[in-house]
UniProtKB/Swiss-Prot annotation:
Annotated keywords: Hydrolase, Protease, Thiol protease, Ubl conjugation pathway
Name this polypeptide is given: Ubiquitin carboxyl-terminal hydrolase 2
KW Hydrolase (keyword) present: yes
Boundaries of every USP domain copy: 698-1202
Signal peptide residue numbers: none
SUPFAM superfamilies, alphabetized: Cysteine proteinases
Organism of derivation: Kluyveromyces lactis (strain ATCC 8585 / CBS 2359 / DSM 70799 / NBRC 1267 / NRRL Y-1140 / WM37) (Yeast)
Gene: UBP2
């Protein structure tokens, strides 16, 4: 990449010809013959200087001058000619020396301007003398004078300007000055510029810079002090006194007590230099100094005049034949322009003079600071002022003075030779020049450009950086370190992209937010450096750290289904196409969080890069099997099962973990042409029709309108201990029941059991056993319950049932399938009017022949058939519709208990059995008299389920349970005012929670269903509801109750302020309307006294403001309280339950449809939807759908104790019958 150059101003034809002719002549001449030529001032003497490295700007040169003393003293060399990369880092740690110059040019000139000798009239030379002074040096007394040489340097700046080229060839913007070696100096410039010889011991640094556009030349020379420490020691106090005493012996005029001060001695020294410098012309008379001068002999070392100052000692002229003695004659410094030897002496005199002024002024300051009695009067010092302003530098170069900025000394700014206040165009120009001249270090310059860009925040620079295909040196090293690599030990160009990606994936998801940012930036840098598009792709589409950010970006709630997210994604892209990549990242984030194949498919379709980099054809079949970790001989359903396990529960090793799994399964599905696998990949749902029957639970046909019974039967089937008990029930079980020692005394539900109930219950278990056997052994995808089972499940326990033999049962079953009923009314149509369930059956379901247990592969038992008419069945179903699910569960479980042999009896003779162990817990209720808290009356009650209400508007399941277990204050006739506390003393293995959703509308005189969402999670902790003596937990419970009461009071006040009156106005709205009325002038129009209207309006404004402030305060307090409450009990999570069944009702209070979701912990935690004869897999998001307005609402939740999931819950149990 070459540096861009500003175009030169156009020359006219005559000018171009002149420049060309001169250039040709110059090229044809030897260097020795240049003395015969005259520079026309129109030709670039250094046409190739732009290729010289390094280059610097005038600001950089100035700063280099000021920091060079540090480098000279520490390393013995200057930085003037060095590339900035070599010293920029050290520079930012240094304090530059002060660059001072003399303001007054009358008594002592420190600047000279004269015409060029080779091109007079067009080219000019300026010379400026200044001092570099250590800012940290301050003499403490007069004897510190000999330390001065260590703390300052002389600076000489020579600038040659070529006015013609300045006018016609100068580029716009910051000028670039390139280093020129002294031996390359053009002969024309050698004749014009006096350069100290390198062998001169006083010269410590000499640098030449030439501008590329106009060949303006800058000569920088840093020179040692003219007086060394030994010289200045002559002006220590003791030396001054010694010299003065010696002079007193020689000159009687001197007063031995009037010893001159250090400043007086320096003043005399200054006057020696001043006179030769002020001589104007060769005709001017020399100011001779007598060798017998009292001041000279008493204040300085007279030998210096001839040995150091180029004076000559001569005899005094003879007058009247009398020779008075000897005198010192100063050197002739007039012809300094043409005579370089004279110029050298004159410049030395100028440096000596400035040096003496600097030291003399310090000496006079010390007189004041030390309070000496004698104060020196020396106008040559007091009238001379040094300035630290750098304006002269920019004036002499004819450049704009740019005020410095703190960023300017940052090494990145230094490396580009830019200042913070440079315009973007100049910064880019400097960068391009640097990389053109120093390609090897382009990465360093790009680092610098990026830093400058970030510091300035310039859009133009940001855009420019973005277009550069360069990786910065620091960026690369930082990236390597993020990846655990030592930049000094590794060649980054040899890195393997896949290895870097593996590292990135393995660390990303377990890193903090800041670490993720570092990883992402590092991968981007390495991807760019290695040219890996896949690495850059991973960076661009990295999922958001917080999934909530993705939901917010797509403007959806986290509870919505995948198809809603797809819709939101599509709409957002249509509205803002420029943000598509952000929306891609958002849907990718959500897909990973939900582990949703559907959303990943959407992303793959909409973002081809995902399909490009995770294409199933990029891996082999064997590699695909290895990714899923499955044997090649495994069947499709086994492969899918293993895949689902890894998909749902595998450790997310990186953001592409699921993409790799999906890619592997796609390869297998494509290779095997598997309908099952390919359907799953397309939908994310297992197509049950493609599965072997033995790998999926059987559905249950709807034989009429069995409401929620099918869901209950599936639910009971999944509970392994209960299912095993039912499957193993036989005549021996019934006989054991009769023989039990507890049989005659036992009670079920607190009452005695009749023989008829017992017979009925045994038959119910037989029929349930046969259904469960069918569900296990059938070769079909669904089974049909007998009408006896349906009838007995719904019929109340007090309804007597007549049983016949098995032959009758088969006939009755067949009659039921053909819809032949005793009542001529169409029962099917009647049922459909009551419940939507019947609509789910598209045609009459063919019921299977009733099989005895022997036909199912087990021993035949005494199964009897209930004699049930169609009317009886319909009436029983109507009873079932009027029951809630818990009544049916109670009826079914009661029959199971009645048919069970008692394990033991409670004190109240209540039977203890498997059902009690699985489903029943125990509630402890304490009645505490308000006036006598010691007299606690405790009562224990069994519970089958806990009832929570949506009418209380709980925000989640915990909030609902809190209402159930909250303390109540009652007035009882027997005890008076009491506090009732409720807690759990014993929990069941299977915890059931009923959600009350049906309420009665007293205005419409009809029931209605509440569809208010009640969020719940997969885990429920019951610690806070247990009967406990733990003081910490009790204190937390008490605080929780107090906070909730406070929250309730705040919300009640909020509702009151926001409530509307009969015309729909809130209190604030009413006040506003009142104010408008008062302001309308209606009262005045009707001659009603309105004197107090202004005060009334003012008062209304106060009320309105008070309402606003109170509502704001209420909102903040409610928010804070809800946050505090939600974080309570975080330490009490020892008694956990896992959700495994969710019963759903869709519809209204008087009609609807039922199904159940059941989780299979043994099959990767998948959720299945049991919808009568259909059993399908569903995404977890469908189960936990708490969308407002959703009429498919959970009404019954079932949890199992944590740690007992595998042993208690087994949804899939299939052993197929052998086909003949």
């Amino acid at each position: 990449m070459m540096a861009s150059q500003e175009p030169a101003l156009e020359l006219n034809g005559e000018q171009r010809d002149s420049v060309s002719e001169t250039a040709e002549v110059l090229r044809s001449k030897s260097l020795e013959s240049f003395s015969d030529l005259v520079d026309d001032g129109k030709t670039l003497l250094y046409g190739d200087i732009s290729k010289s490295f390094p280059f610097k700007t005038c600001d950089r040169i100035l700063d280099d001058i000021r920091i060079s003393p540090w480098f000279l003293k520490k390393f013995g060399s200057s930085v003037m000619k060095q590339p900035m990369l070599q010293y920029s880092r050290e520079r930012q740690q240094l304090q530059p020396w002060n660059l001072v110059h003399l303001i007054d040019q009358v008594n002592l000139r420190s600047r000279y301007d004269y015409d060029s000798m080779t091109c007079p009239g067009k080219n000019t030379i300026s010379v400026m003398f200044a001092l570099l002074v250590d800012p940290n040096f301050t003499p403490n007394d007069f004897d510190d004078i000999d330390k001065f040489p260590e703390y300052f340097f002389h600076l000489k700046i020579t600038v040659k300007r070529r006015s013609y080229l300045e006018n016609f060839n100068r580029h716009v913007g910051i000028t670039h000055y390139h280093v020129l070696e002294p031996e390359s100096l053009h002969p024309f410039d050698k004749r014009d510029i006096f350069i100290m010889e390198e062998k001169d011991c006083r010269l410590v640094d000499q640098s030449i810079f030439v501008s590329a556009d106009t060949n303006k030349l800058i000569l920088v020379e840093i020179i040692k002090p003219e007086f060394n420490s030994e010289n200045l020691a002559e002006y220590r106090t003791a030396k001054i006194e010694e010299r003065y005493k010696n002079a007193c012996q020689e000159f009687d005029l001197l007063n031995p007590d009037d010893i001159p001060s250090q400043a007086e001695c320096l003043k005399t020294l200054f006057m020696i230099f001043k006179n030769p410098l002020q001589r104007k012309s060769a005709n001017s008379e020399f100011k001779i100094i007598s060798r017998d001068s009292v001041a000279l002999n008493s204040q300085i070392n007279t030998d210096w005049l001839t040995t150091m100052f180029d004076f000559s000692l001569q005899k005094t002229a003879v007058e009247d034949n009398v020779q008075s003695g000897e005198e010192y004659k100063p050197p002739d410094l007039v012809d300094y322009i043409t005579d370089f030897k004279v110029r050298g002496i004159r410049e030395a005199y100028t440096r000596k003079s400035m040096e003496v002024v600097l030291i003399g002024k310090q000496s006079m300051l010390l007189e004041n600071e030390l309070g000496t009695e004698k104060k020196t009067v020396a106008k040559c010092f007091s009238n001379q002022h040094f300035s630290a302003s750098h304006t002269w530098w920019f004036n002499i170069l004819n450049h704009q003075h740019i005020e410095p900025f703190p960023y300017d000394i940052n090494y990145h700014f230094i490396n580009l030779s830019v200042a913070f206040k440079y315009i973007d165009k100049d910064i880019i120009k400097n960068y391009e020049t640097q990389i053109a001249l120093d390609q090897e270090n382009i990465s360093h310059y790009f680092d610098a450009l990026q830093y400058v860009t970030n510091a300035k925040g310039s859009y133009q620079l940001i855009a420019y950086c973005g277009k550069q295909d360069v990786v910065g040196y620091e960026d690369l090293n930082n990236a390597l370190q993020v990846f655990g690599l030592d930049p000094t030990d590794i060649d980054a160009s040899l890195l393997d992209a896949n290895t870097m990606i593996e590292y990135y994936n393995s660390h990303l998801l377990r890193s903090s937010d800041n670490q993720r940012k570092d990883l992402r930036n590092a991968l981007r840098v390495l991807g760019k450096y290695l040219g890996s598009q896949k690495m850059l792709f991973l960076v661009e589409y990295e999922p958001y750290y917080n999934v909530q950010q993705a939901y917010t970006l797509l403007k959806v709630d986290e509870t919505v289904d995948d198809d809603i997210i797809q819709t939101a994604y599509t709409i957002n892209i249509a509205d803002a196409p420029g943000l598509k990549k952000d929306y891609d990242r958002a849907i990718f984030t959500i897909a990973l969080d939900r582990r949703s194949i559907f959303l990943l498919n959407v992303l793959t379709d909409e973002c081809p890069e995902f399909a490009q980099y995770y294409n199933c054809t990029d891996i082999s079949y064997d590699e695909a099997l290895n990714i899923i970790e499955i044997d090649m001989n495994a069947s499709d359903d086994v492969i899918l099962e293993v895949f689902q396990k890894k998909w749902s529960h595998g450790i997310m090793t990186g953001p592409d973990y699921l993409l790799k799994l999906k890619m592997a399964l796609q390869n297998i599905g494509f290779t095997r042409n598997s309908k099952l696998i390919n359907h799953f990949l397309d939908t994310g749902i297992v197509d049950v029709s493609c599965l072997p029957v033995a790998t999926w639970p059987a559905g249950i046909n709807n034989v009429g309108n069995t409401c929620y019974l099918n869901s209950l039967l599936q639910f009971f089937f999944t509970i392994k201990p209960l299912r095993d008990f039912i499957l193993n029930y036989d005549d021996d079980s019934a006989k054991l029941l009769d023989a039990s020692e507890y049989h005659s005394r036992r009670r079920i539900g607190g009452r005695e059991v009749s023989k008829q109930e017992e017979l009925r219950s045994v038959q119910f278990v037989y029929h349930l056993r046969d259904l469960f056997n069918d569900m296990i052994h059938t070769n079909s995808r669904c089974v049909t319950p007998t009408k006896e089972l349906v009838y007995l499940a719904f019929a109340p326990s007090n309804v007597e049932v007549e049983f016949g033999d098995d032959t009758v049962a088969q006939k009755e079953l067949i009659d039921l399938t053909t819809d032949v009923v005793e009542d001529p009314t169409d029962t099917t149509r009647h049922l459909a009017s009551c419940d939507d369930d019947i609509i789910m059956c598209q045609s009459p379901v063919a019921l299977p022949e009733h099989k005895t247990s022997s036909e199912a592969g087990t021993q035949q038992y005494s199964v009897q058939v209930a004699k049930i008419s169609a009317d009886q069945l319909e009436n029983t179903l109507e009873i079932g519709r009027q029951q809630d699910v818990t009544e049916c569960i109670g009826n079914v479980l009661a029959q199971l208990e009645i048919a069970s042999e008692p394990l033991s009896l409670e004190d109240d003779l209540e039977q203890n059995d498997l059902v009690k162990q699985l489903f029943y817990g125990r509630i402890k209720q304490d009645l505490i008299p308000v006036n006598d808290e010691a007299s606690v009356r405790t009562k224990y009650e069994r519970f089958l389920s806990l009832l929570v209400n949506t009418g209380d508007h709980p925000k989640d399941i915990y909030d609902a349970l809190d209402f159930y277990f909250q303390n109540d204050y009652l007035n009882l006739e027997e005890y008076g005012d009491v506090k009732r506390t409720v807690s759990i003393s014993e929990l069941p293995a299977v915890l059931q929670i009923q959600i009350q959703r049906v309420y009665y509308d007293r205005e419409k005189f009809m029931p209605f269903k509440s569809i208010e969402p009640l969020p719940f999670g997969e885990t429920l902790y019951m610690d806070r509801y247990m009967a406990t003596e733990d003081p910490k937990l009790l204190a937390e419970i008490q605080q929780n109750a107090e906070l909730k009461q406070k929250l309730q009071d705040l919300k009640q006040r909020q509702r009151k302020l926001l409530s509307q009156n009969e015309i729909g106005l809130t209190l604030k709205s009413s006040l506003i309307e009142t104010k408008k009325f008062l302001q309308s002038g209606t009262l005045k129009a009707h001659d009603i006294d309105a004197d107090n209207i202004p005060s009334s309006i003012a008062y209304i404004d106060i009320l309105i403001n008070n309402i606003d402030e109170e509502l704001k305060s209420l909102f903040n307090k409610i928010t804070d309280l809800e946050t505090t409450i939600s974080q309570q009990f975080s330490e009490f999570k020892h008694i956990g339950y896992s959700l495994f069944a969710v019963f759903i009702h869709r519809g209204e209070a008087s009609y609807g449809h039922y199904w159940v979701y059941i989780k299979d912990h043994t099959k990767n935690g998948i959720w299945r939807k049991y919808n009568d004869d259909s059993v399908t897999e569903v995404p977890q998001s469908e189960v936990f759908n708490f969308t407002e307005g959703n009429t498919a609402t959970p009404y019954f939740l079932v949890y199992v104790r944590e740690g007992q999931e595998q042993e208690t819950i087994e949804p899939l149990k299939r052993i197929l019958q052998q086909q003949e």
